[in-house]
Swiss-Prot record:
Protein name: Uridine kinase
The organism of origin for this protein: Shewanella frigidimarina (strain NCIMB 400)
A GO biological-process term: UMP salvage
EC numbers for this chain: 2.7.1.48
Molecular function per GO: ATP binding; cytidine kinase activity; uridine kinase activity
CDD domains: UMPK
Gene: udk
Coiled coil feature spans: none
The keyword Transferase is annotated on this UniProt entry: yes
Amino acid sequence: MNSQQCVIIGIAGASASGKSLIAKTIFEELCRDLGTNQIGVINEDAYYHDQSHLTMEDRVKTNYDHPKALDHQLLASHLTQLKQGEPVSIPCYSYTEHTRISDTLTMQPKKVIILEGILLLTNPKLRDLMDASVFMDTPLDICFLRRLTRDVAERGRTMESVISQYKRTVRPMFLQFIEPSKQYADIIVPRGGKNRIATDILKARIQHLLAK
C-alpha cells in the first residue's frame, strides 16, 4: 500500500463535543463501501504519555488538556508508518490508572484513518499529515454536561473531581489551545456529532480523495 492510498481525516474539538459520534458514524457507513479492514479510528487519548513512574497522586495532578500531556511525536510517527504501508502498535491508556497499560493494539495499514482528539489541530506535524481536518464547534456548556455524565458513568470519576478538573484545566486549556486551533480546520461542524449534512460532506470528501 502506498501513501496515496491512505487518507487521514482529523476530527478535533472540545471534550464531549461529538467527535467520537461523528467518527463512529463515518466509520460504520464507510465500512459498507470499503470493508471493515480498510478503515480505522485512532483516538488521540491513546497517546497520553506513560506515567507509570509517577505516584497516583502525581498522575491525578497532570494537566491532561495541555498539548505537552500527549506524545504527538509518536502519533505522527505512527501515521507516517501507516501511510508507508507499515503496521503500528498503538498504546492503550487507562483512564482509571491515569497511565498507559502494557497492552498495545496492532493496526494494519488502511485506506482511511480517522483521528479524533481535542488537541490534534494544535500540532503542525499532525496537521501536515491530514488530508482533511474537522473542528466540532459545540457550545462549551453542552460539552461540560456531556463530559460530566460520561466521566462519572464510564470512567470511574466522581462528580466533584470532574467539576474540579473542568474549572482547573479543561475550560482554561480549551480557551488557550483548542478553540484557537479551529482556524486550521477545513470543515467546522456546529450542533455536534448528529449533524447529518456535515457527515455527508465529510464522507463525500473522503470518497473524492480515495478516487484520486
